[in-house]
Amino acid sequence: MATFTVNGKSVTVEKNQKLIRFLRDELHLTSVKDGCSEGACGTCHVLIDGKPTKACIPQTDKLEGKTILTVEGLSDWEKQVYTFAFGEAGAVQCGFCIPGMVISAKGLLDVNPDPTREEAAFAIRNNICRCTGYVKIIDGILLAAKIFRAGKLPAPSADDWQMGSRVHRLDVEEKVLGYGQYPDDIYVDGMCYGGAVRSQYARARVLSIDTSEAEALPGVICVATQKDIPGKVNVGHLKKDQPTLIGVGELVHYLGDSVALVCAVDQETVEAAKKLVKVEYEVLPAVHNPTEAAAPGAPLVFDEEESNVQAYKHVSRGNAEGAIKNAKYVLTEHFSTPWTEHAFLEPECCVALPLDNGGVKLLTTDQSAHTTMHECASMLGVDYDHCQVQNCLVGGGFGGKEDMSVQHHAALLCYLTKRPVKFKLSRQESILVHPKRHSMDMDFTMGCDENGIIQGVKASVVSDTGAFASLGGPVLERACTHAAGPYAYENFEIEGRAYYTNNPPAGAFRGFGVTQTCFCTETLLNQMADLVGISPWEIRYRNAIRPGGVLPNGQIVDDSTGLVETLEAIKPAYDEAVKNGDPVGIACAMKNAGVGVGIPDWGRCKLIVEGDGKVHIYSGASCIGQGLGTVLVQVVVTNTGLHRDDIVYERSNTWIAPDSGDTSGSRQTLVTGEATRRACEKLKAELDAGKSLADLKGTEFYGEYLAKTDPLGADVPNPVSHVAYGYATQMCILDRDTGRIKKMVAAHDVGKAVNPLSVEGQIEGGVVMSMGYALTEKYPIDENCKPTAKYGMLGLFRANQIPPEIQAIVVEKPGLNVAGGAIGIGEITSIPTAPAIADAYYRLTGEREFSLPLKNTPYAPKK
């Protein structure tokens, strides 16, 4: 027992427990976010006697007489300042890390009211952010310090909410102050908890499952196995190959496979009961990598498949082999890129509530409420009106929350027990379960003429897609179609194969396969520049695709193509670095916006004038931190002339909001933005006719947009693989003395920047994420196909490790005739970073590396 003070009130704790559990579960102070429970991420920071401390570390019995402060306990003035400063700086994206950042900032500013930028970065070194790249969080802390010193709030720099305005995001306050709800922040009467009994082996056959001891444990409500599933057993994003539960006689495919589910009155009982479920296995040889998977006589990951090949892609145009044979210069290299963990700050969580009609309502953190509805309804064997899904705040995704993780398990337990169920993955489960970035091995050959003009590229790609299909096929396709780079040449051929293994599944990750093949193409182009005797900038400028040019996939690009403009934007900084003798690396990239390649790609939006006299925006598109809600409000303001206060953004749900597809593929700003614009046209017509919002109460205005494209290989004069591409040039400058990065420059063509503040944040965040990909991040898997790293050992960059300067250059190239010309930027920001960094280190050391993460840098782990 211990007595201490929390936010000015004395509390007595009878049961010894981690402080985070007491604050969240008993006091419901949900600004204290649970990101890892391992002392690694910093989302649970509180002040203990004025010192920032991770609440997941101390036990309550050790806190006698201490004074504890959470964000809820800040003064009203402090809350106003941090909300304004973080909003003005653009410091908030998914928001899950932000209350912890605020606490660390207060710990600094209470003792140092005028810190330097370096001191602010050091103060949040124990707080990880995966979205922002820290730049704007540090800006927010310094602005807060300035406001505290001045004693009054300034006016916001922009508040007109037109497209192009640097407005504060609409969700800033709830995220800064921690009262916005992620699923784990939800507590309801009678709520019980769920957990999964997972396989002990990567490949084995289940011989028996005995749940009797677990069922007899006091506090256990139910233990479910495959026989309890009322509908279809398998789920899966595209291919239904992932069993909700593995049944007796069936193969487990990786260590994350579930064989039973436990539902109990609290999480402690869940964990105890899981240990009492007895599973007998026939252990079988596992498939560890694509080489083993492709070997003659290899074990099959799936009984029902004829081979371990999950996907095959062949993309060809012209005569690559002939062009390379006749080229002046030819280079061939083998490249290898690693598995990468998304490491979003919010672990997967779902709260399932029973509906009066016998169905379930799911409160989720995922990238598509409608996809979750489709898969869970199929598993339960119910109609869609018996499976409702509501997005809560989403604490980051980056592709890692496209697949089922906990939603189907929460739905099943709720459906069986008729009780509210919270189902959350531990951080280690999250690291094991959700799909990762594919590791790839790639062989590339490039030929150029004497002027450095690309004549042809030929390549092969092999990816490890792990235990399930997930999005392995589309990722492989995108890796292949974009491997040619954003350049104008005709001869291109690439073969790609994705293999099933018994590793954790791989799927969507920011960049969607392009991050891997871009590393190859851009590295070869840098080598080729040296052979030809021109600069890496010049070789790109000569080859860059321009309006009216033809990409290697056959698509004639339009006037919105802005690659040259991004090259020109970084040219002054590039020339200065070369003049100063700084080691400098450069790389370009392109990335599609939208699904493309002939697949129907719908954006949908419904504007409803509700009883409050305001326009409510409903779309099935998930806002996962990228700022979609703010974008849609700006679209409505711009296209209707209404005031911001007349508009309400509603989070995605499945019973009112129309399906607008997954938040992936950099698509939502374009496709849902255009659908929203079309809905606005109808509303504007009524307003122009003299009607007021009061007159329009109860009226709905629907907009939809189909991004029409052609399938790969379509026999048409101008095959349109994608409705739009984003283009980028990034540059890395090293400090020759320390060998560390002193500046990153990233110029990105976004068409129209709906909110330049958010665009800059996306650029900075993508750059820092891929700095980790290039230099430090790792996802080691042992001989048992088990990932071995904890969250704190993944190699994620921290605030005091980023370069002194990350310059985001927003290039606006008009020409796109939808969504006001806006192109999504979520993915491309992370694509050219690694090859730019790799070339900078070659310029420093004279040694070129073809595998990631780079080994010969000051960032590499000490041997």
List where the protein language model places each region:
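Helix-loop-helix junctions that connect adjacent transmembrane helices in secondary transporters/permeases
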Residues: 295-380, 544-614, 695-720, 788-798, ...
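Thiamine diphosphate
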Residues: 397-418, 422-424, 628, 634-635
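C-terminal catalytic domains of large/alpha subunits in multi-subunit enzymes
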Residues: 226-227, 381-386, 416-421, 450, ...
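Flexible, low-hydrophobicity surface segments
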Residues: 145-310, 330, 416
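Signature of N-terminal electron-transfer/Fe-S-associated modules in redox systems
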Residues: 1-156, 597
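Phosphate/diphosphate-binding loops
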Residues: 258-259, 264-266, 418-466, 673-694
